[in-house]
Amino acid sequence: MQLKTTARLCIAALLVAGGALAQAATAEQSYVQSAQTINHAELALGQLAQQQGSSDEVKQMARTMVERHSALSAQLADLARERAIATPQHPSTEDERVHDRLAKLSGTSFDEAFKQAVADVHTRELALHRGEVERDGDAGLRGYAQSRVSALEASMAQAKDEW
């Protein structure tokens, strides 16, 4: 009788542990996919601004965004591959709508809308990465998230001073 009870307790513990592992994997997958979607959004915005930006400031910012998010996208793709997580290859539908709206603008109207779009994406991105840091999950993903939090905080402070 005691053996049956012990076996049942072991099975229950394994089921609970398995459920916790599945939740962690789902959280990691969600984080990676959201972060990569944002990388693609910033790449697309940067490429558009390189073509349509009217000020040197916007064009330089766009070049920096494309370089940075190309590298971040590759880094995150490597982390995802190591964890067998599929990554999206495009921005979200919402971000594609923002891109399409900006594509219809020109001159200073484009520049101002671009700066606002970047600020909005950075705000979402910062919240995403902070959440991953606080989640205390996979060490590699947490390290990536922490590096993004630091970089975004610095970037947003600089943008606030300059714009």
Please provide the spans of the model-predicted regions.
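His/Met- and acidic-residue-enriched segments that coordinate or traffic transition-metal cofactors
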Residues: Q2-C10, A17-W163
